[in-house]
UniProtKB/Swiss-Prot annotation:
Family: Belongs to the peptidase M48A family.
Cytoplasmic-side segments: 34-89, 143-167, 219-306, 379-453
Co-factor: note: Binds 1 zinc ion per subunit.
Lumenal side: 1-12, 111-121, 189-197, 328-357
Protein name per Swiss-Prot or TrEMBL: CAAX prenyl protease 1
GO cellular component: endoplasmic reticulum; endoplasmic reticulum membrane; mitochondrial outer membrane; nuclear inner membrane
Reaction(s) catalysed (UniProt annotation): Hydrolyzes the peptide bond -P2-(S-farnesyl or geranylgeranyl)C-P1'-P2'-P3'-COOH where P1' and P2' are amino acids with aliphatic side chains and P3' is any C-terminal residue
Bilayer topology term: Multi-pass membrane protein
Source organism of the structure: Saccharomyces cerevisiae (strain ATCC 204508 / S288c)
Membrane-spanning residues: 13-33, 90-110, 122-142, 168-188, 198-218, 307-327, 358-378
Further comment found in the protein's record: Present with 19600 molecules/cell in log phase SD medium.
Length: 453
């Protein structure tokens, strides 16, 4: 009888080579896409629908900005691939695990030194997260204070950058720690039939995140100010009343303290009241009609049940991942290859980790690397679904009579954000969650004022 678990649990399977190969293949594929996009940026002509909307100076700046981001993307990908290969080649996971155990033994009283694998996993992930943050500091610094600064977008100070990082790590430990503990305890409690318990748990976490993050977490990083009474507020409330949108409050967020990029969105569970959030950069630079048109698009996502659709898709994606994980999560050869053993028969491994139970967190992290080919394919699917949603939301705003103002707002945002004008189709189908501006304007049947005249 065909038993996938037994077939995969074989000491001769080169797990390190497989994961390294998948990682290199993903890097090569994504680098190829970036190369295609970089070549596309050499084009000196705008898409026809943008010819009367974008001046030469803006087009030139946009091309330079996009090229700089493409180069940085390649460097970042090389940097991240090198990290992954170093971790695999030099068995850094068991080394960090030993550090975690030593830290626990140093902190806890002697009688608690034989701590559980779950406790060791939590400490391991805390150390790994801290190490990853430190290793990624140069990339983060360059992104904000060199690349974004060069093109006039960065408003961050070094002090605010460091403060944000400390807050993020603190929240990750304070909130992520208990969530991870419960996640691992499910495997501990239900080692053979964890799938449905994990599904329910992650669904609850997702719903709580959608509820808690906008109301309690995001205000720790930005100031949310109620929109003042006036023309804009009346226009938004009138739109909400017209379409039956369950509007609760409208806030303006001080996004300008970090970046000059603009955005607008709403928060709230699918069947509850909603909060609309406007970036101050949007409020200060766009007309009332344009902002209302942008929100008509956002409300289109609500009216078309896109949030519900994405939650369902997310759950199906999660189910697929954990269904596949059942075939390998207790695979002895898989853990042994990376230095984790349940007994002392460690062969030639120099500094093995001996645990009472399978360290699920290690297995899941490495398993995600095995999923690289599947996740690359899923990326195309997720981008397609998201782009379809954007077209539908645009069509909804057009149906409400906001076509021209939405187009003007999209063009204005494109100019102010120096967004890419010419995009390679394969690159965008993988990386872009939104259609390009040219694609959206074409779908909306936009005709510039110059051509009308």
């Amino acid at each position: 009888m065909f038993d996938l678990k037994t077939i995969l649990d074989h000491p001769n399977i080169p797990w390190k080579l497989i994961i390294s190969g998948f990682s290199i293949a993903q890097f090569s594929f994504e680098s190829y896409l970036t190369y295609r996009q970089y070549q596309k940026l050499s084009e000196t002509k705008l898409p026809p629908v943008l010819e009367d909307e974008i001046d030469d100076e803006t087009f030139h700046k946009s091309r330079n900005y996009s090229r700089a981001k493409a180069k940085f993307s390649i460097f970042g990908d090389v940097y991240n691939l090198a990290q992954k290969l170093v971790f695999i080649k030099y068995d850094l996971f068991p080394k960090i695990w030993h550090m975690a155990v030593s830290l626990l033994n140093a902190v806890l009283p002697v009688r608690f030194h034989m701590v559980s694998t779950v406790a060791q996993s939590l400490c391991f992930l805390g150390l790994l997260s801290s190490l990853s943050t430190l290793v990624d500091l140069p990339l983060s610094y360059y992104s904000h204070f060199v690349l974004e600064e060069k093109f006039g977008f960065n408003k961050l100070t070094v002090q605010l950058w460091i403060t944000d990082m400390i807050k993020s790590l603190t929240l990750a430990y304070a909130i992520g720690g208990p969530i991870l503990y419960l996640f691992l305890k499910i495997f501990d409690k239900f080692p053979t039939d964890f799938l449905w318990y994990i599904m329910v748990f992650l669904f609850v976490v997702q719903i709580l995140a959608m509820t808690i993050i906008p109301v309690f977490i995001m205000p720790m990083f930005n100031k949310f100010t109620p929109l003042e009474d006036g023309e804009l507020k009346k226009s938004i409330e009138s739109l909400a009343d017209r379409v039956g949108f369950p509007l609760d409050k409208i806030f303006v967020i001080d996004g300008s303290k970090r970046s000059s990029h603009s955005n607008a969105y709403f928060t709230g569970l699918p069947f509850t009241s909603k909060r609309i959030v406007l970036f101050d950069t949007l409020v200060n630079s766009n007309s009332t009609d344009e902002i209302t048109a942008v929100l008509a698009h956002e409300i289109g996502h609500w009216q078309k049940n896109h949030i519900v659709n994405m939650v369902i898709f997310s759950q199906l994606h999660t189910f697929l991942i954990f269904s596949l994980f059942t075939s390998i999560y207790r695979n002895t050869s898989f853990y042994n290859t990376f230095g984790f053993f349940l007994e002392k028969s460690t062969g030639s491994f120099v500094d093995p980790v001996i645990t009472k139970e399978f360290p699920i967190i290690i297995g899941f992290m490495l398993f995600n690397d095995l999923l690289t080919p599947l996740e690359c394919a899923m990326q195309f699917v997720m981008s397609l679904i998201s782009r379809t949603h954007e077209y539908q939301a645009d069509a909804y705003a057009k149906k409400l009579g906001y076509k021209q103002n939405l187009c003007r707002a999209l063009i204005d945002l494109q100019i102010k954000n120096l967004s890419t004008m010419n995009v390679d189709p394969l690159y965008s189908s993988y990386h872009y969650s939104h259609p390009t501006l040219a694609e959206r304007l074409t779908a909306l049947d936009y005709v510039s004022e110059k051509k009308k005249n």
